[in-house]
Each structure stands twice: as structure tokens, then as C-alpha cells.
């Protein structure tokens, strides 16, 4: 089954990640994208902490596409298993 859009969860300053979810049927898949990956995608300078959600929303389609690709490839990390996206995940 293909992943579908879940929800924005929050920006975690101490970990420098944005947490979000994707949905597989009726199961939520926890996901995270590093702020450095988002900055690299946007070729942005320093983004203020209060702008991370807005930045995520601008990049959401690209981030979720890559999360879906990692899901299909079963590239899970962590406990509970989820998808973690870093800058290298967007290099082609």
C-alpha cells in the first residue's frame, strides 16, 4: 500500500529535526527530516526556529515523496521503526 500524507507534528530544536507522520492504511508511520536537509533542499541560509513549520510546508511534497521511497525500500530506523531523512537522502 502506498503511503499517504499524515500530519506535521513539531519542530524539535534540540535534535534539529521536524517530526511528521505518514499513513499506511490505518497505521501512522513516524517520520523525521533534519533541518540541514530542508536547508539544503531550499538552498537557504539560517532559518529561524519559528519558521521551520512554514519551511516544512513549502517542501512537504518533496519530503513526503522521499519518505515514501524509503518506506517502500523498508529503510526504517529507530524505535518505534520510522523514516528518518537526512541531506544525503535527497542527493541524486
Where are these regions (language model features)?
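Intrinsic-disorder/low-complexity peptide segments enriched for small residues
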Residues: 1, 39, 83-86
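Surface-exposed beta-strand edges and flanking loops
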Residues: 5, 35, 85-87
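Short secondary-structure boundary micro-motifs
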Residues: 3-6, 14-15, 39, 53, ...
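Intrinsic disorder/low-complexity signal
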Residues: 8-11, 25, 39-41, 63, ...
Amino acid at each position: 500500500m502506498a503511503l499517504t500524507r499524515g500530519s506535521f507534528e513539531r519542530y524539535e530544536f534540540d535534535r534539529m529535526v521536524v517530526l511528521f507522520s505518514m499513513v499506511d492504511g490505518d497505521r501512522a508511520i513516524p517520520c523525521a527530516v533534519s533541518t540541514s536537509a530542508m536547508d539544503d533542499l531550499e538552498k537557504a541560509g539560517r532559518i529561524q526556529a519559528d519558521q521551520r513549520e512554514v519551511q516544512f510546508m513549502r517542501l512537504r511534497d518533496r519530503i513526503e515523496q522521499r519518505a515514501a521511497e524509503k518506506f517502500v525500500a523498508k529503510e526504517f530506523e529507530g524505535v518505534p521503526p520510522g523514516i528518518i531523512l537526512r541531506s544525503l537522502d535527497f542527493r541524486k
